[in-house]
Structures are given as C-alpha cells and as structure tokens.
C-alpha cells in the first residue's frame, strides 16, 4: 500500500507541474503581445453539463464508511458550468475562468455534489486546458481538465476530460454539454 501511495503522490505532483508549466508558458507568450486596443469582448459559454465519473482507489469505500452513501465505481454527473473568458486577442488564446457545479450518483439514488473552480486557456482552435480546486463530500483536491469544443450549427459542444487525484484515490470524468456559440 505504501508503494502505491508514494507512486500516486509522485504521479500527482508530476501532473500538477506539467499542467502549471503548460499554463504559464502559454499565458506568458501571449501576454507580451497584447495591446489594450486588440482585446475583444467577453464571451459567455455557460451551460448544462453531463457525463460520467470513475471513482478509483478507496473513494467508494470512503463514501460508504463516512457518509453511508453506497454507489458503484461509476456515477453519472449532471450540472451547470459557469464560464467567462478574461480577455482575448482576435485570433489568440483566451484566458478562462470556470465554475462547475455537478451532482453525481443520481442514477443510483445518491446525491454527490461537487464544486470545481478552473482557471485555464482555450486556443483559437478550441482546445482548452485548466487547473483548479475541487470540493466534494470526500474532501478537497486539485482538478486538472482538458478538452475540445465542437461547433454544431449555433451550438458549442464541449467535450472535457478531468482527473482529480486525492488522498482517497483518483476520480476521472468525461463531461459534455452545450451552449450557444456566440
């Protein structure tokens, strides 16, 4: 058990370092080029989100022992993402601020709320990456997310993957949703 815990800690620390280097590198390279007159309006990409989360490690056991919540290792997620971009250049990357409120386990008669705040970047090609705190009944952790937004007519359809390593195990999610493409 100790070897797994040490490996998971090194893996989590390495993933956080990589995510921070990518975010900082992308942010600093574009901030130098920005002029106030080049900045464009903010875009609201808030909308419903839904998907699934895999609960790894001892998360299922922790929920059972601490909260008397009995769920399978895979739970559905439903919720809302509030998203704003900070600023962007006409054809440059966008700095993002996202709050994601989800309720998991409804398919199993459980209520597992989570709140995640992500700060990240979306490229002109609609690829995005973000990192930030996550709070659930099982505790707090650091969430790392990446995804791509497809354009389907007047809709923006994001597909995001997130990994949340915690002391109880790793949660992995795939979420999608929609909002108006503005």
Language model region names:
Residues 102-123, 128:
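Mid-length scaffold segments of soluble, non-membrane domains
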Residues 1-41:
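Cleavable N-terminal export/targeting peptides
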Residues 33-79, 179-181:
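Short glycine/proline- and aromatic-enriched beta-strand/turn motifs that initiate or cap beta-hairpins
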Residues 94-105, 126-137, 155-165:
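Transmembrane beta-strand segments that form the barrel wall of outer-membrane beta-barrel proteins
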Residues 168-182:
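Outer-membrane beta-barrel "beta-signal"
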Residues 72-78, 111-115, 136-142, 155, ...:
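Residues that define the transmembrane beta-barrel architecture of outer-membrane proteins
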Residues 81-83, 118-120, 145-149, 175-177:
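Outer-membrane beta-barrel architecture
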Residues 87-89, 124-126, 151-153, 181:
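Outer-membrane beta-barrel channels and translocator barrels
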């Amino acid at each position: 058990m100790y070897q797994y815990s040490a490996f998971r800690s090194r893996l989590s620390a390495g993933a956080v370092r990589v995510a921070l280097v990518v975010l900082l590198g992308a942010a600093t390279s574009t901030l130098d080029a920005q002029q106030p007159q080049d900045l464009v309006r903010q875009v609201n990409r808030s909308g419903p989100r839904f998907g699934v989360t895999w609960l790894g490690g001892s998360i299922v056991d922790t929920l059972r022992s601490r909260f008397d919540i009995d769920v399978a290792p895979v739970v559905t997620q439903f919720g809302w993402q509030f998203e704003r971009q900070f600023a962007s250049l006409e054809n440059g990357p966008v700095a993002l601020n996202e709050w994601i409120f989800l309720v998991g386990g409804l398919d199993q008669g459980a209520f597992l709320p989570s709140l995640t705040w992500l700060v990240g970047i979306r490229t002109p090609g609609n690829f995005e990456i973000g990192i930030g705190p996550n709070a659930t009944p099982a505790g707090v952790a650091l969430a790392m997310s990446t995804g791509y937004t497809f354009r389907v007519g007047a809709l923006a359809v994001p597909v995001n993957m997130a990994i949340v390593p915690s002391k109880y195990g790793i949660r992995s999610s795939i979420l999608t949703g929609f909002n108006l493409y503005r």
